Amino acid sequence: MAVMAPRTLLLLLSGALALTQTWAGSHSMRYFFTSVSRPGRGEPRFIAVGYVDDTQFVRFDSDAASQRMEPRAPWIEQEGPEYWDQETRNVKAQSQTDRVDLGTLRGYYNQSEAGSHTIQIMYGCDVGSDGRFLRGYRQDAYDGKDYIALNEDLRSWTAADMAAQITKRKWEAAHEAEQLRAYLDGTCVEWLRRYLENGKETLQRTDPPKTHMTHHPISDHEATLRCWALGFYPAEITLTWQRDGEDQTQDTELVETRPAGDGTFQKWAAVVVPSGEEQRYTCHVQHEGLPKPLTLRWELSSQPTIPIVGIIAGLVLLGAVITGAVVAAVMWRRKSSDRKGGSYTQAASSDSAQGSDVSLTACKV
């Protein structure tokens, strides 16, 4: 497998960016690559997306007409043409690495050429509120299952099966972890700092959730109480239910946090309660944008029982809007890359034309 794919893996920027402020909480930058083979229909489809925290800022799709890495956030558009040229070269190189890796992995698993197969890769870094490196990661998957992952020490690998052991031995012999570590705690961090500064108006904002509760009768004896949090940023939020002060985690239906399509997020948590006992239940909301946690209780006189078909439909639509990003994110691991070369492709130091991603062009899987 190749080591970080070009554009989508932060390339470089050796020049240190002076940090002039402290950020609230930690921040992350992640790249996701997905390659899907299409037997009889030409080259595999390759999709790359980059995220800073919960914001997608770049995207590449080999099926798109432009055949270019494209901006997905206003603050990244200020990067010059050299940056976009480099980013495009990087992802195209990664797509070719994955193309070869798909064939290699098919051989490892003794699979025929008839079926479609998928390679997924995720890598990136986190920084603390002071802008310093916290952790780095690299995870690869094949056909939706873990394949190989960089351990927390950034010096060793964990292989998921016998086939992945082959890749592990290759990468160990080529010292791939050392090269990747240099990128993760160096180049990746510098680019993340740069992006946080350039996009601070959106990336460092906190939008508190708008909350309310809805009541949905199930029968004469039971009803569902649903606690809603809408329009918040960043995505991290906690919704919990209590009955007479006791946690109801076991009985809570909790959906994953969902993008709202406007840069904010939505989430709800629900419990089924005996009719007439609604006021014994409270919903507790914690979010970075709130000065203190909120407590909500159903008040029969304050709002009527309402249907939520419209709200649910809206959430479904929002989910569809970001399907493209999810496709890449679903790849949450995998990167059986096969590249030619021996180390990450890094452009000249402090050259902003370089991408923030890295080129995984070294070892083959």
UniProtKB/Swiss-Prot annotation:
Residues 209-295 form the Ig-like C1-type domain. Changing residue 89 to G: In allele A*23:01 and allele 24:02. Changing residue 121 to R: In allele A*02:01, allele A*02:05, allele A*25:01, allele A*26:01, allele A*34:01, allele A*43:01, allele A*66:01 and allele A*69:01. Changing residue 345 to S: In allele A*02:01, allele A*02:05, allele A*23:01, allele A*24:02, allele A*25:01, allele A*26:01, allele A*29:02, allele A*31:01, allele A*32:01, allele A*33:01, allele A*34:01, allele A*43:01, allele A*66:01, allele A*68:01 allele A*69:01, allele A*74:01 and allele A*80:01. CDD domains: IgC1_MHC_Ia_HLA-B. Changing residue 133 to L: In allele A*32:01 and allele A*74:01. Changing residue 158 to K: Impairs binding to TAP1-TAP2 transporter, resulting in impaired presentation of intracellular peptides. Changing residue 208 to A: In allele A*02:01, allele A*02:05, allele A*25:01, allele A*26:01, allele A*29:02, allele A*32:01, allele A*34:01, allele A*43:01, allele A*66:01, allele A*68:01, allele A*69:01 and allele A*74:01. Keywords: Adaptive immunity, Cell membrane, Disulfide bond, Endoplasmic reticulum, Glycoprotein, Host-virus interaction, Immunity, Immunoglobulin domain, Innate immunity, Membrane, MHC I, Phosphoprotein, Signal, Sulfation, Transmembrane, Transmembrane helix, Ubl conjugation. The alpha-1 domain is a structural part of the peptide-binding cleft. Induction: Up-regulated by IFNG, and pro-inflammatory cytokines IL1B and TNF. Residues 3-11 are annotated as: VL9 epitope. Changing residue 180 to Q: In allele A*11:01 and allele A*24:02. Changing residue 187 to R: In allele A*01:01, allele A*11:01, allele A*25:01, allele A*26:01, allele A*43:01 and allele A*66:01. The modification Phosphoserine is found at residues 343, 349-350, 352, 356, 359. It is found in: Cell membrane; Endoplasmic reticulum membrane. Residues 115-206 are annotated as: Alpha-2. (Microbial infection) Polyubiquitinated in a post ER compartment by interaction with human herpesvirus 8 MIR1 protein. This targets the protein for rapid degradation via the ubiquitin system. Belongs to the MHC class I family. This is HLA class I histocompatibility antigen, A alpha chain. Changing residue 279 to K: In allele A*80:01. Changing residue 3 to I: In allele A*34:01. Changing residue 138 to H: In allele A*02:01, allele A*02:05, allele A*23:01, allele A*24:02, allele A*69:01.
